[in-house]
Amino acid sequence: MKKIPLVFSGCLLGLVGAGNLLADSLPFLAHAFSLTGLFFWFFFVVYHAIRWQETKIELQQPALLSGMATFPMAGMILSTYLLRLFPAFGGLSQLVWWSAFLLDLGLILYFTKTHVLARPRANATPSWTVLYVGIAVAALTYPVVGIREIAYLALVIGFGLTFLLYPLIYHDLKQSPLPSHLLGQEGIYCAPFSLLLAALVRVGGASLPTWFLLIMVVASQGFYFFVLTRLPKMITEGFQPAFSALTFPTVITATSLKMAQGLLQLPFLTVLVWMETFLCLLILVAVLGGYVAYLRE
């Protein structure tokens, strides 16, 4: 059996994100995804801790290290599941949340020091948005700790870095395109605006102006449909571990649309929510199946 690659962390985030998406509509399936994500999250920690010397060498690659923010992001979402599962043990959920949040911050600071401020600067890739905008998961999950100020700060940082990173990534990829084995990272393009939309709805709720919600929905969906146009090229290249980058972005896009629709109440969006929910689950299961086949080769 092959070594479980670090990029599998993206599937962990996809699994727990799917559990969160289905929590109020298909609770049995939501538990299945969340528990599977919880199991593999802990397994992933132990597996790579045992092989730390190998893992440490792999983490020297900027494109890989930046994508590892999916691990603490999954931890923050898992904390919300633990709170639902064990409401009497709120301290456990808060411990997981704070540990994941601080790990995410530490990863951001370390990456910035070693790969952004260093000269020459590493080429920006789509996974940079996972690292820098992914902190907005703190705003999406802030009720676990109940500190709104963290949510506001995470949103401000997320928005600011989104508008900074897209042009930078575009510029760098024009100079140095993604290699074929990293094409799956193109799935990340739809994640930032979708995550920010979901976090905004969580924090702002009904106080959000309708026009602003619509702008965010259009931005989120625009990048989502762009990603869908890239799928045929990715598929023709054959399965790659980097396909894990397709899981959470499509899940959070469906989640954000569902949350926004709860406020907008536009009939045609209901159909779109169910279509995107089905598609993101199909992608998640297909990628997990691809991993099973890949690891058994």
Where are these regions (language model features)?
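Aromatic-anchored, glycine/proline-accented short structural segments
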Residues: G158-M216
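Helix-coil boundary and interhelical linker segments in multi-pass alpha-helical membrane proteins
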Residues: N20-A30, L82-Q94, L140-Y152, L200-F212, ...
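Short hairpin/turn module used for nucleic-acid contact or packing/dimerization
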Residues: L264-E297
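Hydrophobic, membrane-facing alpha-helical anchors
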Residues: W41-I57, W98-L117, A136, F159-L173, ...
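Structural signature of hydrophobic alpha-helical transmembrane segments
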Residues: L29-F43, G90-L105, R148-T162, T210-Q221, ...
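Juxtamembrane helix-loop boundaries in multi-pass membrane proteins
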Residues: M1-G19, E54-T80, W97, K113-L140, ...
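Membrane-interface capping segments at transmembrane-helix boundaries
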Residues: A49-Q53, T229-K233, G289-E297
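N-terminal signal-anchor module of multipass membrane proteins
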Residues: M1-H48, L288
